[in-house]
Amino acid sequence: VNVSSVQDFYQCPFRWVMKWVENRVPKFEGPALAEGKLLHLIFEDHLKGVLTMEEACEVRCREWLRLARETNEPGLMTIAQKAVTGIKDRQEALAQWTDRYEWQIPALEVEEPFEIAFDEMPGVIFRGRPDRVGVMDNEVWHIQNRGLAGSMNFGVYMELATRHYHEHLYAEQNARKYPQYKVGGTLFNLVRKLKYRTNVGKKNEAVKTLDQMFFQHPMTINLKSRLHTHVMQSMFAHVERMQEVEARYRENGTIPPPNEKMNGGFVGNSIDPYFRILTGTASIYDNTLFKDREDTYAPADDTGIEVG
């Protein structure tokens, strides 16, 4: 079970079946998601000591556009251009980003897939791939790089993250894989998707402060706490339900009810690709609309580009 699939399931069982049982996803991802992937690659290049942040922005943006161009898909190229424009709007600020935390071991591993099982879920293997794992103050930490919407409050995000399934699963994995260290939790590197400079060349030209753009903060995870126990129990309960839904779908084609709020897209003003499957006006096997899902927990291909 990919931990991401659990999140997809509780958001919409119908879309979960299309994505994780039929293994079909929309052919074109949204620009915001594409920009998030690009930002993720830039941070990893920089934090591994491969490139300066400015160099990483330049190299990754060029590569992103080149790969999109080679697909000969105008739609993919448009999305790639929007993602690169977003990075360019923040590149000057990204060049000023610094890691505020000192690491004994900056990178025990980077983008390394894992599998883990629990006695409570016999026969189920959970899969994940943390961004980076490092050691600070004799504790092992998952380092999560994340781009957020410009309107997202850092404090709100951090509070909501206390129940993110990924982070609790990664803490369990780190405890088993690195028993020589105590478990710290997750260190978040957050970036708001804001333009660094606005009204360029005008009287009211302004720049954002770095504190408006960036936020870096640790979230501790206590494996013996009631919170952690309940998060894991909740994830297990969802997986049991997932197994039931998949079995009924495979046996007699029973389609689970959708989350109708998702029919209008992210903000409700567009048609979600899966909606037309529900209305019978499109097919999940139409290759002009959907493509096969790629395994996001396979070893990283170092591009981040998904080609339909």
Regions found by a protein language model. Give the residues of each.
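Non-catalytic protein-protein interaction segments used by genome-maintenance enzymes to assemble
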Residues: 105, 109-166, 171
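Short, solvent-exposed loop/turn segments at secondary-structure junctions
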Residues: 23, 115, 149-150, 191-195
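Hydrophobic (often cysteine-bearing) scaffold residues that line and stabilize catalytic clefts
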Residues: 31, 35, 39, 76, ...
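Nuclease catalytic cores
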Residues: 3-51, 109-112, 268-277
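Short amphipathic alpha-helical segments and their helix-coil junctions
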Residues: 1, 13-26, 143, 149-153, ...
